Curated annotation (Swiss-Prot):
This is Elongation factor Ts. Belongs to the EF-Ts family. Residues 82-85 are annotated as: Involved in Mg(2+) ion dislocation from EF-Tu. It is found in: Cytoplasm. PANTHER family: ELONGATION FACTOR TS, ELONGATION FACTOR TS, MITOCHONDRIAL. One of its GO terms (molecular function) is translation elongation factor activity. The keyword Transferase does not apply. The gene is tsf. InterPro entries: EF-Ts_dimer_sf, Transl_elong_EFTs/EF1B, Transl_elong_EFTs/EF1B_dimer, Transl_elong_Ts_CS, UBA-like_sf. It comes from the Bacteria. It comes from Helicobacter pylori (strain HPAG1). GO terms for cellular component: cytoplasm.
Length: 355
């Protein structure tokens, strides 16, 4: 420690946020050269970060920022290993700088972010330095950066626990309706945060996915019906289809004729068929689009009015406001979705760190 002053140690600590003993060791290793000591600590920090990187980061935050004019919005998922660190002021500052960098460089993917400059160095280098200082693996996992063309707005909602965030984009024609469209987008975002639709529209499903889900759905309903029969309760209809994408014009025409043939066989006069068939068709479509009702935003029943789907709510607003509204963007992030946290014995984890 000869020749290493307390002032030099303090200066290095102020520059790097590293621990006092680490700063002393670094200065001794490089004979008091401040720049080399900074490099030494950076290398040491990166080394620690690399060891931490094989630990699962499944806590953290979902953070979003909507522009005041509702013409753009950003959302990011940043993972940490523990909820405690996610509440750390240093972690909050990292989240803030991440959003600032995304905005400044028009970033749309994590790969772009890591290469982008922040304070004259790559963001990736800044991230590694924060991993070393905070002491946990930190991962910028997802980024959404939406920009609205003319006659579109974007609004969003982040749950107060910072574990769920949603962005919604809506197209409209009448500018005087913009404030109401902004509010509608936020309400729909709140719905999506709670109800977890996987996609915006059934058109986003593959036919293979729908067929697989329909088989599982039928098995589920048959099981429910066994219990309902035992209890003497009404049975649910067994669907033939699961999604609107399967209900082609030919399928609907065939079903309509089947209903008409049924009414004819019952001796119902043809002049009243038009009053009966539409209701039967509506029920047929409802029974055969259960996957849409569960997994699509437009097909779900609105939490604020459970007699209408989101699609119907948007259509009703269009009519009421003399406009032509359409949801064009839907992005939902849920913290740690798809990640499984490692269940490790704490003593074993400490032992691994000591290696």
């Amino acid at each position: 420690m000869s020749g290493i002053s307390a002032q030099l140690v303090k200066k290095l600590r102020d520059l790097t946020d590293a621990g006092m003993m680490d700063c002393k060791k670094a200065l001794v290793e490089v004979a008091g050269d401040l720049q080399k000591a900074i490099d030494f600590l950076r290398e040491k920090g990166l080394s620690k970060a690399a060891k931490k990187a094989d630990r699962i980061a499944a806590e953290g935050v979902i953070a979003l920022e909507v522009a005041p004019d509702f013409k753009s919005a950003m959302m990011v998922e940043i993972n940490s290993e523990t909820d405690f660190v996610a509440k750390n002021e240093g972690f909050k500052e990292l989240v803030k700088k991440t959003l600032e960098t995304i905005k400044a460089h028009n970033i749309h993917a994590t790969e772009e972010l890591l290469k982008s400059p922040l304070d004259n160095k790559p963001f990736e280098e800044y991230l590694h330095s924060q991993i070393a200082v905070i002491g946990e693996n930190i991962l910028v996992r997802k980024i959404a950066h939406l920009k609205a063309p003319s006659s579109h707005i974007i609004n969003g909602y982040a749950h107060s626990n910072a574990r769920v965030g949603v962005l919604i984009g809506i197209k409209y024609d009448n500018e005087k309706n913009a404030p109401k469209v902004v509010e509608l987008a936020r309400n729909i975002a709140m719905h999506a945060a709670a109800m977890k639709p996987q996609v915006l529209d059934c058109k986003d499903f593959s036919l293979d996915f729908v067929k697989k889900e329909t088989l599982a759905l039928i098995a589920e309903i048959e099981k429910d019906n066994e219990e309902a029969k035992r209890l003497g309760k009404p049975l649910k209809n067994i669907p033939t289809f699961g999604s609107r994408i399967e209900l082609s014009d030919e399928v609907l025409a065939h079903q309509k004729k089947a209903f008409e043939d049924e009414l004819k066989a019952q001796g119902k006069p043809e002049k009243i068929w038009d009053k009966i068939v539409p209701g039967k068709m509506e029920r047929f479509i409802a029974d055969n689009t259960l996957i849409d009702q569960r997994l699509t935003l437009l097909g779900q029943f609105y939490v604020m009015d459970d007699k209408k789907t989101i699609a119907q709510v948007v259509a009703d607003c269009s009519k009421e406001w003399d406009d032509d509204l359409k949801i064009t963007e839907y992005v939902r992030f849920e913290l740690g979705e798809g990640i499984e946290k490692k269940a490790e014995n704490f003593a074993e984890e400490v032992a691994l760190q000591m290696k």
